[in-house]
Amino acid sequence: MSVLDVLWEDRDVRFDVSSQQMKTRPGEVLIDCLDSIEDTKGNNGDRGRLLVTNLRIIWHSLALPRVNLSIGYNCILNITTRTANSKLRGQTEALYILTKCNTTRFEFIFTNLVPGSPRLFTSVIAVHRAYETSKMYRDFKLRSAVIQNKQLRLLPQEHVYDKINGVWNLSSDQGNLGTFFITNVRIVWHANMNDSFNVSIPYLQIRSIKIRDSKFGLALVIESSQQSGGYVLGFKIDPVEKLQESVKEINSLHKVYSASPIFGVNYEMEEKPQPLEALTVEQIQDDVEIDSDDHTDAFVAYFADGNKQQDREPVFSEELGLAIEKLKDGFTLQGLWEVMS
């Protein structure tokens, strides 16, 4: 099983997660912690805390920690600043985050309740940019710019453990002769005749590493995760002793990586935040039974509403007997009540 098969933190948007899911996973690092942040779209008027890690953004209510959000960076489509109406700050500059999870778009608005502080914007935008520019650590890549002058272009924090010449890539009928690099982050192979014919396989994406028989004899076979396309790649390493030694080394490095992954998202704050465990409040179980099979409508408030710039005008609803924001064309109150049915 690849590390990616159990990694959800940067690849999902979740609502009201358990205290266990709010804790950092191996390799996840808390970069910044901002108090007095309002979730203006879903919990307007509720003071909360925003935690920025190298994989996601976590927001939780200070009054009710079980009211929370976990937003993975891989789901973020766009981050902008706009004016929003906060119950605690009035009209103020806010951070807008548009996300897409599976086929559903969610929009989040966060307001810093500390006047004149740009830290909310700088932290989230900078860390997300660091995530976007470090995909070589995490993504399976074919024909990328990983080789320069026959040498591997090392990533920060990357170290080469072995370089093996004369390794055949068995992707074609006759095979391609090339060079094989084993590092603490990934495996890279490139053709000797053409540097651009290459493959970079992060340990994060590796599902299995085995020795199998092929028409070329015994070969190293690497299977990648389903998320990367489920590739099966074969490499011929001679002699057999070197093949066995290499497989043992790769399995060992993969095991070390799985225990403490290097995600490559590097951003240093001047002030170091406390550990995440010290910042999240333990959720107290109410004296009631919770049916986990029931659907939760916690996410309904966050559905992305097109390019809405401001609230629509209030209108009187005879059905409810109070003033409500005018519904979008094609929407009805009855339909909104049935959104989860």
Swiss-Prot record:
GO terms for molecular function: phosphatidylinositol-3-phosphate binding; RNA polymerase II-specific DNA-binding transcription factor binding. SMART domains: DM16. It is found in: Cell projection, Cilium membrane; Cytoplasm; Cytoplasm, Cytoskeleton, Cilium basal body; Cytoplasm, Cytoskeleton, Microtubule organizing center, Centrosome, Centriolar satellite. InterPro entries: BBL5, BBS5/fem-3, BBS5_PH, PH-like_dom_sf. Belongs to the BBS5 family. The BBSome complex is thought to function as a coat complex required for sorting of specific membrane proteins to the primary cilia. The BBSome complex is required for ciliogenesis but is dispensable for centriolar satellite function. This ciliogenic function is mediated in part by the Rab8 GDP/GTP exchange factor, which localizes to the basal body and contacts the BBSome. Rab8(GTP) enters the primary cilium and promotes extension of the ciliary membrane. This is BBSome complex member BBS5.
